[in-house]
C-alpha cells in the first residue's frame, strides 16, 4: 500500500539543437546561429499516472512543437528575451507548475563552448497544494 503522496512529475528535454537568429551584429542577424535549449518542467501527473492516460499528461512533443517556430522564425538581440518567450510558451501549458529554460548560444565567444541564459517560472501555489 502506498503511504506517500506521488504524482509531481519532472519532464526534462535536454540539449534540443536548433538554429535561430540571435545577436546584435549585422552578420549575426543575417545567418542563423546554433542554439541548444534545455527545458525542465514540473506538473501534477497523478491523474495521468493512476489512469495511465496520455491525454492528461504533458505531451513533450507538443512542448517542443510550440517552441520551434519561435526559435526558427523570430529574431532576438538577447538570449534573455528568447529565453523569456520560450518560458512563456511552456507556461502556456496550464498544467505546468514550474519550468526552467536554458538557452545556449554555441561558439558565441572565443575559447568557449557556449554562452547560456537560464530563466525559471512558477505558478502561484493554491492553498491546497503541498
Indicate residue ranges for each PLM-predicted region:
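N-terminal, polar/charged subdomain of small-to-medium soluble alpha/beta proteins
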Residues: 1-130
